[in-house]
Every structure is written in C-alpha cells, then in structure tokens.
C-alpha cells in the first residue's frame, strides 16, 4: 500500500479484499472503494481452500472443480474414505502412531503438503492429542532424514505423494554409467519412488500411496483436497475433537493484540 501511495496509483484497481463484514479490512475496502468479497465466518482458514479464498485468483473451469468434488462424494471414494480413516484411527489408538510423514516425490505437490500439514496440526493437535505432520521432499530427503524413517522409532505413518502421466522429459545423454543411458529424470525419480516403497514393505512400515493424474490435474487435485478435509474431520470426530477451531493459537492472537496497546 505504501508503494502504491508513493507512486500515486489507484489502489481500487489493484486490490481485492476477502474478509468478514464489519471489521478493519472490510471497512478499509469500503472507504477506498475496493472490490470486496464477504467470507463466511463459519469457514475456518484451512477449510476454506475451495471457497473464494482459495479459488478467486485462479481461472479454473468450475465444471472440473465439481467433477473433482463428485469423485470423492459420489463415485465410491467415500467408502475408501471411511475405511482409511478407520485404519488411521486404529493406528493412532492401538499402535502408538503419533506422527504422519508426507513423502512428496513431485515438486508441484509441495504446496499441498504444507497445507495438509496445517490441516492436521490445527485440527488434531488439541487436548493432549496429536498426529504430528512432517513434510519430506523426496528424493532429496533420501540423503538426510530417510535413515531415521527406516530405522528410527516406529511411531510414524507415511503417505507417498506423486504425480503420474507427467510430460516426458529429455533422456540423459551417455555421460555416465550405461545404466542411465536413455533414462530421463522422471525415470530415475520413479525408480527411487518404487525402491523406497519396496523397502517400506520389506520392513513392515505402515504407509499408503496417493497418485495424482496429470491427465486430469484439476479434477485429481480437487479430489485430493476434498478427501483430505473429510478424512481429517472424520478423525477428529472419532477422537472427540472439534476439527474446525484452533483455540491455543487464538491465545497468541489475543496476547499479540494486547501487546500492541
């Protein structure tokens, strides 16, 4: 805002405000004639990604968004949802699993990973309970924390995330070992992904695999978002937790506000 004021730019043509009514932001928007979208007060931040908060900036085909949502609610994934949530609940309660590790093998899924981390932490981390979410960017983390995952404390559940049907990339030229000849970077990452799964199976480490189809990227990604929110809400209800609040963090907000005078 300071920059725009210094350059005498019209902020009404460059800013959009998304907020609840009758607060500092909405009053600012009204005063400066900014485009304003009212946000539902009952839709907490981490669950708002498919509202105007998450979708306004993207020119997405709404039909594909609906297809992604329907694939979870109407096409059989709902049965998997209940079954998987029940499995996770059993692991949490009976196997002393208290950590969820996301092994992300596709760089473009990292933003999802950090959102999912927030979703789990703020929804389940209450009343002395937790399912601590950790993000691992793979195969980079094969060379750091993977040793702990494989041979450390057995208190973790893992989810492998990867995109499939990616655009073909260029094969590596014959600079190195013959084994790499005519192999692309995707081929090498696929091999590392599959090798890790094989070792997890061998060591009886609990995990699941989530694959995002790049032939239908919007539908697949929306399905993943919806599935994640519903699974988390089901887990919270089974653990007698409110999935939609974050009371401990609210205390910091109140304390910060009081310190500002």
Regions inferred by a protein language model and the residue ranges of each:
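Glycine-rich phosphate-binding loops that contact phosphosugars or nucleotide phosphates
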Residues: 1-77, 254, 258
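Predominant activation on well-ordered alpha-helical scaffold segments within soluble catalytic domains
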Residues: 2, 51-57, 66, 114-121, ...
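Hydrophobic/aromatic beta-strand patches that form the interior of the parallel beta-sheet core
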Residues: 16-18, 35-37, 101-103, 158-162, ...
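Short beta-alpha connecting loops at secondary-structure transitions
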Residues: 37-42, 180-181, 237-240
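Acidic catalytic cores of enzymes that act on phosphate-bearing nucleotides/polynucleotides
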Residues: 62, 66, 74-199, 203
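Small/polar glycine-rich anion-binding or flexible loop at a beta-alpha turn
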Residues: 137-138, 211-221, 248
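Short glycine/proline-rich, acidic loop/turn segments that cap or connect secondary-structure elements
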Residues: 201-202, 219-234
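C-terminal amphipathic alpha-helical interaction region
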Residues: 241-261
């Amino acid at each position: 805002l300071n920059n725009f004021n210094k350059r005498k730019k019209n902020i009404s043509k460059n800013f959009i405000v998304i907020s609840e009514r009758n607060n500092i932001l909405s009053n600012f928007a009204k005063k400066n004639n900014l485009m304003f979208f009212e946000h539902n007060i009952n839709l907490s931040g981490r669950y708002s990604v498919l509202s105007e908060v998450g979708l306004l900036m993207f020119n997405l085909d709404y039909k594909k968004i609906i297809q992604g949502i329907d694939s979870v609610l109407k096409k059989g994934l709902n049965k998997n949802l209940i079954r998987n949530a029940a499995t996770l609940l059993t692991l949490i309660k009976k196997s002393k699993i208290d950590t969820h590790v996301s092994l992300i093998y596709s760089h473009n899924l990292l933003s999802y990973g950090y959102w999912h981390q927030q979703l789990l932490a703020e929804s389940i981390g209450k009343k002395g309970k937790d399912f601590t979410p950790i993000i691992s960017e793979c195969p980079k983390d094969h060379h750091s924390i993977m040793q702990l995952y494989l041979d450390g404390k057995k208190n973790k559940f893992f989810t492998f995330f990867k995109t499939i049907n990616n655009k073909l990339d260029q094969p590596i030229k014959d600079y190195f070992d013959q084994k790499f000849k005519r192999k692309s970077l995707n081929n090498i990452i696929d091999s590392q992904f599959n090798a890790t799964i094989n070792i997890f199976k061998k060591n009886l480490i609990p995990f699941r695999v989530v694959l995002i189809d790049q032939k239908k990227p919007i539908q697949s990604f929306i399905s993943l978002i919806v599935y994640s929110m519903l699974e988390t809400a089901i887990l919270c209800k089974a653990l007698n937790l409110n999935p939609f609040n974050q009371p401990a963090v609210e205390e910091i907000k109140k304390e910060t506000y009081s310190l500002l005078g």
